[in-house]
UniProtKB/Swiss-Prot annotation:
Keywords annotated in UniProt: Hydrolase, Magnesium, Multifunctional enzyme, Nucleotidyltransferase, Repeat, Transferase
Regulation: Uridylyltransferase (UTase) activity is inhibited by glutamine, while glutamine activates uridylyl-removing (UR) activity.
Organism: Burkholderia pseudomallei (strain 1106a)
The UniProt record lists the keyword Aminoacyl-tRNA synthetase: no
Name of encoding gene: glnD
GO biological process terms, semicolon-separated: regulation of nitrogen utilization
Protein name: Bifunctional uridylyltransferase/uridylyl-removing enzyme
Length: 858
């Protein structure tokens, strides 16, 4: 008798069958260039599985199973939610509830991410009436199995209740609110392919609005209706296809629903599209640029379509227009409208005129859909002849020189791609990412952010933000020179080579072609060449050294250049990331500006006179504090000239008041106060010096979540360390006054211990740093005078990094004289001034450099 093989239970067989079908589709998703057919196939396979479960659960024919949302549209990405509605007749037996629960449970067991609702027709209509999300999901409802009559009754009731105008207003408001969550820009470093501005949700929103209004449910139907042109329909289909493919591949690569194009997945996603790294660009940068261009096109076309749909749903009650440029432009309901569809073909110089009128005409709040469409379809007109036309060059300069509206005009020029077609080198950096770990914007967005920051200096209502910058720009003649420099300072990023030198050549050519001559042209070119110099001097060099100030003053040469460079530098740093700027950096730059201005005004950078001035100012402050007249001498007699040059009068007075009674203290004295220059804590440490002191202090800060911004280390003549630190708390909303006493007590107790230095904590790197690690660099060299050694360190930022460096130095008994801690987002560029004793030995230098590289390695 032959043995029979037992058949697997139906549920197991069905699960294996569906799993195999889905796996086969997922494999095809990995390489398919057009995923819409696969999305439909996955939807059909899911339909079949749900029908089978429905029948197995014995659900009666009086019910209906309805697909809603994206599933209703028949489009499923590999790991999308499967949204279903179980539609009930008005009267139904309560025992159905158990069967429905079993059906939904079995669907989950099948591996489907089910989103379910169980409602009658009345309940659906009621829910949709006060929840636009429910109303939207039901718009694309599709029957899978069950009662056709019930489903048709539901759809009839739904359509009768749907108010197209109210739906339009709700969806446009919803879209604006969604865009606001992403700062109204598609240029996020980790965009959400579905939800970000210019993403799939924008395209879906337009089709939902059009469908609700009865205008059609596809790009072809909207084309037929006259809402878009053939060319626009092709562009929409092409970009929609790319975004769908990108989202599907993200799902497959992540093995789950993943709509955010996170750093960790960007390289794999890029490789799935065939991008390969080049000497100039990573594969991920090439993919991201394509994404940004697609999102930008979607944003442009969505704006046109929404305005067109709005015009049909809400016909204008008044046709009153105002002529702005005869035969070219009128103002209609607050929008700039072309007088005829072929204005730009007949008058190419009207293209830039549109932005000048938008900028300069009160009451004009934007460009109409008709104007935007004409711009979009006039790309062929924007050719070399158009760029060389003297009329366009004059208009471009007029746009730059208007008293207001410049930022809005340039942003709109970029959104409509006109700016990149006029400045071809600008077009090259549109959508270009910057993986330098501190820029959080693409190059084009960063440039426009810098332009915006300079403009804000000149706007009275923003004068409270940076009062010193606002004060300077008020008296700065022809500020448009700064705007030109802002446009060109990073325009050569990503070409390979020195972007400052390459950008200089671009700026020089622009000036020549646009009639900018003499000192103005020279200033623009010089600013582009040296736009990084002031921040490097302020943050990496010892600005208490008169030689440093004198050398910088010689480079600058004039007060106008100094002011221009200062304003551009502040705007540039502010335009990299909200995290990079802080008030401490602002103070360093302002101090450098004032010291350089004094030299340019004829003051000689003389250490002796500066020493005398600082001491006199400090004594005046001490008298206000009722410190006895000669009480300061005991401390000051132990301090060298360097101490007085590195600290301002207010700090000298504070430290003297704290220490004049304790010059020969037996125990550590620690005092802390909120920093006078910004949101930070200033910590004073006075204790008998030892080789591991700096490392021990850094260890305490590291363990307590305090980041060091600046360290000024001094050794008195009688062997005491007088160290000053500016630190910030990594947690937000900390009240430094509240933690000052705690820091004083804990740090003093830590310094009283004789325990060995603890092992550095290997803090966790951010995802950005893990994905785009920078090559750590260590440079150790003698300074120009041979008095100290300068240690420069560049690495990914992480908790414990400064202490790791300090510990290596302590182990080799290398003293730290000063430290400039420069944190740029996820990157640090620190500079230390070290005691030269012993470092003249080349073997020790090499050993220290080697161990430092090991300590800072990712």
């Amino acid at each position: 008798m032959s043995a029979s093989v037992a058949e697997p239970p139906p549920a197991l067989s069905r699960k294996a069958e569906f799993k195999a079908a889905k796996a086969e589709l997922l494999a095809r998703f990995k390489s398919a260039n057009h995923v819409t057919p696969l999305m439909h196939a996955l939807s059909r396979a899911t339909d079949d599985a749900l029908r089978s479960l429905w029948q197995e659960c014995g659900l009666p024919a009086t019910l209906a199973l309805v697909a809603v949302g994206g599933f209703g549209r028949g489009e499923l990405s590999p790991h999308s939610d499967v949204d279903i509605l179980v539609l009930l007749p008005d009267a139904h037996a309560s025992e159905l509830d158990e069967r429905i629960e079993r059906f939904i449970g079995m669907a989950w067991d099948l591996g489907l991410e089910i989103g379910s609702s169980v409602r009658t027709v009345d309940q659906c209509i009621e829910e949709a009436s006060h929840d636009v999300t429910v109303q939207t999901s039901l718009l694309e409802a599709r029957r899978i199995v069950g009662s056709t009559a019930l489903f048709e009754r539901f759809m009839l009731r739904y359509r009768e209740a749907l108010d197209a105008r109210a739906f339009f207003q709700a969806k446009v408001l919803e879209m604006r609110q969604r865009h606001a969550k992403f700062q109204d820009t598609p240029y996020s470093l980790e965009p959400n392919v579905k939800e970000s501005p210019g993403g799939l949700r924008d395209l879906q929103t337009i089709l939902w609005i059009a469908r609700a209004a009865g205008f059609g449910s596809s790009w072809r139907e909207l084309d037929t209706r006259g809402l878009i042109t053939d060319r626009e329909a092709r562009e929409l289909r092409r970009n929609e296809g790319f975004l769908k493919t990108l989202r599907a591949r993200l799902h497959v690569i992540a093995g789950r629903r993943q709509d955010i194009l996170v750093f960790d997945l960007q390289t794999q996603a890029a490789e799935s599209f065939g991008y390969q790294p080049t000497s100039a660009k990573r594969a991920s940068e090439q993919l991201m640029r394509r994404y940004y261009w697609a999102a930008k096109a979607v944003t442009q076309l969505a704006t046109i379509l929404i305005q067109n749909i709005e015009a049909q749903l809400f016909p204008a009650t008044s046709g009153v227009t105002r002529v702005l440029s005869p035969g070219r432009f009128v103002e209609k309901q607050g929008m700039l409208e072309i007088a005829a569809d072929d204005v730009f073909e007949r008058h190419p110089d009207a293209i830039l005129e549109a932005f000048l009128l938008y900028e300069a005409t009160r009451g004009v709040k934007g460009l109409s859909a008709r104007t935007l469409r004409a711009l979009y379809n006039s790309r062929d007109v924007m050719n070399n002849a158009w760029r060389r036309d003297p009329r366009n060059r004059r208009t471009f300069m007029q746009i730059l020189q208007q008293p207001e509206g410049i930022t809005h005009a340039f942003r709109l020029m970029n959104q409509t791609s006109v700016l990149g077609r006029y400045l071809l080198n600008f077009r090259r950096i549109v959508g270009q990412m910057q993986h330098d770990l501190y820029h959080v914007y693409t190059v084009d967005q960063h440039i426009l952010m810098v332009l915006r920051n300079i403009r804000r200096f000149a706007v009275a209502e923003h004068a409270h933000e940076y009062p010193f910058c606002s004060q300077l720009i008020v008296n700065f003649e022809r500020p448009w020179v700064l705007y030109v420099a802002a446009l060109f300072h990073d325009i050569a990023k990503g070409r390979g080579g020195d972007h400052s030198a390459l950008g200089m050549a671009d700026a020089r050519r622009f000036c020549r072609e646009h009639g900018i001559e003499g000192d103005d042209a020279a200033l623009v070119v010089w600013l582009v060449q040296h736009h990084l110099t002031m921040s490097q001097v302020a943050q990496k060099q010892d600005t208490s050294d008169p030689v440093v100030i004198k050398r910088f003053a010689e480079l600058v040469g004039s007060e106008r250049r100094l002011t221009a460079l200062y304003l551009l530098t502040v705007a540039d740093i502010r335009g990299t990331s909200p995290k990079v700027w802080n008030t401490w950096k602002g103070k360093l730059l302002e101090d450098l500006y004032r010291a350089t201005l004094a030299v340019l005004g004829g003051a000689q950078p003389d250490a002796h006179s500066e020493l005398k001035t600082r001491q006199e100012e400090a004594l005046a402050l001490l008298r206000l504090e009722t410190v006895p007249p000669d009480a300061h001498r005991a401390l000051w007699d132990q301090l060298d000239v360097g101490y007085f040059l590195r600290h301002d009068a207010a700090d000298i007075a504070w430290q003297t008041r704290v220490l004049y009674r304790h010059v020969a203290a037996d125990t550590a004295i620690v005092r802390a106060r909120p920093s006078p220059v910004g949101d930070a804590l200033q910590v004073l440490v006075y204790v008998k010096d030892r080789s591991d002191l700096f490392a021990g202090i850094c260890a305490y800060f590291d363990r307590n979540g305090l980041s060091v911004l600046d360290a000024r280390v001094n050794t008195t003549r009688h062997g005491y360390a007088l160290d000053n630190f500016i630190v910030t708390q990594t947690e937000h909303d900390v009240q430094y006054r509240d933690i000052a006493n705690l820091v004083e007590q804990q740090l003093a107790a830590r310094l009283a211990e004789s325990a060995p230095l603890p092992e550095p904590s290997k803090g966790r790197l951010s995802r950005l740093s893990r994905t785009f690690p920078i090559t750590p660099r260590v440079d150790l060299r003698a300074d120009e005078r041979g008095q100290y050694y300068i240690l420069s360190v560049s690495a990914n930022d992480r908790p414990g990094l400064l202490y790791s460096i300090a510990r290596v130095l302590a182990e080799h008994r290398v003293g730290v004289h000063a430290a400039r801690i420069n944190t740029l987002g996820e990157r640090v560029e620190d500079v230390f001034m070290l005691d030269g004793t012993g470092l003249s030995d080349n073997r020790l230098q090499i050993q220290v450099e080697t161990e430092l590289l090991r300590a800072i390695a990712v």
